[in-house]
UniProtKB/Swiss-Prot annotation:
Note, other: Target of the inhibitor of GPI biosynthesis YW3548/BE49385A.
Pathway where it operates: Glycolipid biosynthesis; glycosylphosphatidylinositol-anchor biosynthesis
Provenance organism: Mus musculus (Mouse)
Transmembrane residue ranges: 2-22, 443-463, 481-501, 503-523, 544-564, 566-586, 592-612, 619-639, 650-670, 686-706, 724-744, 787-807, 825-845, 859-879, 895-915
Protein's recorded name: GPI ethanolamine phosphate transferase 1
Glycosylated residue positions: 128, 192, 295, 350, 616
């Protein structure tokens, strides 16, 4: 059986990894020829300001007094330059946002798993194409463009990462540091001939990354005074830097300025998803080569923003974020970034029709180059008779469009050139997408076939080893087995040869060959299949249909809960009424009334708001007091039942209660310290980490008696959970644990069925009891319900307090008791542990259910595995590659979550067994005893 689980884990890792090869492969290609506009550029230098985390509405709108928060930028919009909204794509994070701005392509999703701060995939950027680039700002952003540059012409100046502290007194210092360093730089340039020569060259870029607004947004929310004051500070800084440039270069009119943001921010201070507050960012540009403000009476945009911002009289020109890279390249005359998919927004250019036409033609050729390289790569890796080219853009069509465009330029039909080039770019981008997803259907079918085969084999294993289906007596010769084996070997060889001829990557061999041994294992069990068919034929058809409908409905409820959290509420309401429909409640009315009460109480949580809530310390404190009351109730109950606690175990229980009190104090103290902008107290940080470290050890010091050990696990994990809570979610594990304890009692009551031994008292059950394998019974239909309950409770633990499929459901304030300095991996790990704590509580309860129902954990686990795999197959087919970027990202994340859950179940099961069955001795004392 151990071999089966090891193979199962390996197979699920393959299925999990397949999504990265099918949907998460790098779209980048290499080997293109650089393309640049063959005319003198309007600017010699470009200054790029990126205000990290700045929302478009917060910058453009007027305050309560009717004044702008950024008067200099607003003056630019009205008197000097052009403006609009830059539309970002999901994920709205700093790295993909800057890659889109500076390199012109959207986040290479294959890089997500490889690194947060540096993009490990080689790509070209505006900085690489420039003669010199000087950049100032965050150490998280600048290095990835410097390391990706060829040569040493990209210079970076970063502050220490420790400055990125969400609990710091004043995050605007991050921005003033940048402005001060730029001023020092130009002071030094006046006295350094070598540097003076460099900054006076053409094709030079200055990049100012301003992180203060983002940091203040995370720490205080975008509606806060700190966030809005930071915008004013940035505006003042930009005004001063512009003045320095004009003074240094003698106001030569050869400097272009761009002010924008990498992403916005939600009202609750997070970003990453596709809410308009995250995807709508400001874009203001002025200076050399930029069109002056244009008064208009009507605009093409239907939204109400223009009236709210009182900018309806000034021409608004929206862009996609990747379009900014070709605009910057055009302004200073450098080659367009090789991997850019941005479309030059010619409406921003203040230049001749010829310059606009030539720039647009260059843009089209640059994107067409990528299409041609991608097509060549795919053609070379596919058998000629199997290759299907992109029909909308054949070689002859490419030549026709390019000749036509060049002819229009000679005839000075510049508007027609722009339209024709936009059409060519659209076709080339569609062609790029076509070749990028060329193998998707082929790989998808292979993975799906493997999935179905695995589920079939697992089902047959359950029927063979854990069911009462009668086995037929047949005598089979070895010949059919040999024939079957040789057939599958031949199939595998043919598949391998086919892949070898096409020079496919090694991962393709894994996805295409994996179904072969799986289906061989399925068809080898043809005797079990025959027994199953014969048994089903004797089973009442109406009962079979009813069971199938209930099972299908249950699976669909689980799947729908990923999209609609209220489906969990509906399920819990059904759970509450289940005992009353089956007459079970007449056996133990208090138990089943408790079951109904806690089911309905837990059903409230999925109806609560996912995010956007303000910190509510009173609810966290309330949860802490309830934990203390519960622990006192446990001690009292044990005393009433004459259960003696060993001195050491009583001490552990008291220390766990003290840990809960300390956690409450740390949460309260940290919250008020951050409000006063005094940062995270060191003692609070030490206590928090010590509590986290002890939470997995303390339960091992308690008694292994079922109720005592479960209470100890809850107390330990709740201390950590309180430290990671900011509001109502602190109550969630408490209510969930109460329901789990009642679930154990409910499952005991269901044992009063014919053929099942009488139940034991919970107080007499030990997690460490040596159960004879002969006592394990075979699976029955009720066990499928138990497995379904487990999966449902796991999903409730997952989505009960938020939709973690969306990255912006995370509130960074949750980790402020542990750290406030920006550290994505450490913060992510703490968030993950917060998510896993309810999981662990459910799995520990499931361990108890298995013991009380005398059921083999292997048999029940296999049923859970099948339910999870059916859900995973659902989401595999629901993955989208079209529609909004939010829909695409969400559909992929759902599949990843289910597959992760299936894989994690094995590890969580092991962790639950460790927490429930292992016992550490204190000073050589014996284990607790019952009286």
């Amino acid at each position: 059986m151990l071999l089966f689980f090891a193979l199962g884990l390996l197979i699920h890792f393959v299925f999990f990894a397949s999504i990265f090869d099918i949907y998460f492969t790098s779209p980048l290609v290499h080997g293109m020829t650089p393309q640049f506009t063959p005319l003198p550029p309007p600017a010699k230098r470009l200054v790029l300001f990126v205000a990290d985390g700045l929302r478009a509405d917060t910058l453009y709108e007027l305050d309560e007094d009717g004044n702008s928060r950024a008067p200099f930028i607003r003056n630019v919009i009205i008197h000097e330059g052009s403006w609009g909204v830059s539309h970002t794509r999901v994920p709205t994070e700093s790295r993909p946002g800057h890659v889109a701005l500076i390199a012109g392509f959207y986040e290479d999703v294959s890089a997500v798993a490889k690194g947060w701060k540096e993009n490990p995939v080689e790509f070209d950027s505006l900085f690489n194409e420039s003669k010199y680039t000087w950049s100032w700002g965050s150490p998280d952003i600048l290095p990835m463009f410097a390391k990706g540059a060829s040569g040493d012409h990209v210079y970076t100046y970063s502050y220490d990462a420790q400055r990125e502290d969400f609990g710091a007194h004043d995050a605007t210092k991050l921005d003033t540091w940048v402005f001060d360093k730029v001023k020092d730089f130009f002071d030094a340039a006046r006295n350094n001939q070598s540097l003076f020569t460099k900054v006076n060259e053409e094709k030079v870029v200055f990049f100012l990354h301003l992180l203060g607004i983002d940091t203040n947004g995370h720490a205080h929310r975008p509606s806060s005074r700190e966030y809005k004051d930071n915008i004013k500070k940035v505006d003042d800084g930009v005004k001063e830097i512009v003045s320095i440039f004009k003074h240094f270069y003698g106001d030569d009119g050869k400097t272009a300025f761009i002010f924008t943001s990498d992403h916005g921010m939600t009202d609750w201070g997070s970003h990453g998803a596709g809410h308009p507050s995250e995807t709508l960012t400001p874009f203001v540009t002025w200076g050399a080569g930029i069109k002056f403000p244009q008064n208009v009476s009507a605009q093409q945009y239907d939204d109400e923003f223009l009236k709210e911002w009182r900018l309806e009289n000034w021409k608004r020109r929206d862009v996609n974020q990747a379009d900014i890279a070709p605009l910057m390249a055009s302004l200073i005359g450098v080659p367009f970034p090789l991997n850019s998919v941005g479309i030059l927004p010619v409406g921003y250019l203040n230049n001749t029709g010829l310059f606009k036409a030539e720039s647009m033609f260059t843009n089209a050729v640059q994107i067409l180059e990528q299409f041609k390289v991608k097509m060549t790569q795919k053609k070379e890796a596919t058998l000629p008779f199997l290759f299907t080219p992109f029909k909308l853009l054949s070689d002859s069509q490419q030549l026709d469009i390019l000749r036509k465009a060049r002819s229009y330029i000679k005839q000075e039909k510049f508007d027609e050139v722009v339209s024709l080039c936009e059409e060519l770019i659209d076709l080339a981008l569609r062609g790029l997408s076509y070749y990028h997803t060329y193998d998707r259907l082929f790989l998808g079918i292979n993975v799906a076939v493997g999935f179905v085969g695995w589920m079939s084999y697992t089902s047959l294993l359950i029927i063979k080893s854990h069911s009462n289906i009668p086995k037929g007596t047949r005598k089979e010769g070895k010949k059919p087995h040999c024939l079957l084996l040789y057939s599958f070997i031949a199939t595998g060889v043919l598949v391998a040869c086919f892949l070898m001829i096409q020079a496919c990557p090694w991962t393709y061999y894994v996805y295409c060959l994996l179904p072969v041994p799986i289906w061989y294992a399925v068809l080898r069990e043809h005797e079990v299949i025959q027994d199953l068919v014969e048994s089903l034929l004797t089973f009442p058809r109406s009962h079979f249909v009813a069971y199938l409908l209930v099972f299908t409905l249950g699976i669909e409820v689980l799947v729908l809960s990923f999209f609609y959290r209220y489906m969990l509420t509906a399920g819990l309401i059904v759970f509450a009424g289940w005992p009353f429909l089956t007459q079970l409640w007449t056996r133990a009315k208090i138990t089943f009334l408790s079951w109904a009460f806690f089911s309905l109480l837990l059903a409230v949580f999925p109806l609560m708001p996912v995010v956007g809530r303000k910190p509510n310390l009173s609810l966290v404190m309330g949860a802490g007091f309830l934990v203390l009351l519960l622990s006192l109730a446990v001690v009292t109950t044990l005393g009433k039942r004459n259960i003696k606690l060993v001195k050491g175990e009583l001490l552990v229980l008291l220390l766990q209660m003290l840990s809960t009190v300390l956690s409450m104090y740390v949460v309260y103290s940290t919250h008020h310290s951050l409000l006063k902008k005094e940062g995270l107290p060191l003692m609070n940080q030490i206590v928090s980490w010590a509590t986290l470290a002890s939470s997995l050890v303390a339960p091992l010091l308690s008694s292994t008696a079922l109720s005592q050990r479960l209470a100890s696990i809850l107390l330990s994990l709740m201390s950590t959970y309180l430290l990671l809570s900011t509001g109502y979610e602190a109550l969630f594990p408490l209510v969930l644990s109460c329901l789990m304890f009642v679930w154990i009692q409910v499952e005991q009551e269901t044992l009063q069925q014919p053929g099942v031994s009488c139940k034991q008292k919970l107080t007499s059950i030990q997690f460490t009891c040596d159960t004879d394998i002969a006592q394990f019974r075979q699976l029955c239909p009720d066990d499928i319900r138990r497995a379904f309950f487990l999966v449902f409770f796991l999903l409730t633990a997952f989505f009960g307090t938020g939709n973690i499929a969306s990255i912006n459901s995370f509130d960074l304030a949750s980790v402020y008791c542990f750290l406030t300095v920006f550290s994505p991996f450490m913060m992510g790990a703490l968030m993950m542990w917060k998510i896993l704590i309810p999981f662990v509580l459910v799995m520990c309860a499931f361990e108890a259910v298995q013991i009380t129902t005398q059921l083999s954990s292997k048999g029940l686990f296999l049923v859970v595995l099948i339910i999870s795999d059916i859900m995973a197959l659902h989401f595999f087919f629901l993955v989208k590659d079209s529609g909004s970027w939010l829909d695409i990202g969400t559909s992929i994340s759902h599949y990843v979550i289910v597959m992760s859950m299936t894989i994690f179940l094995v590890f969580l099961n092991g962790l639950a067994q460790l927490l429930t069955t292992k016992k550490l001795q204190l000073c050589g004392k014996p284990k607790s005893h019952l009286m």
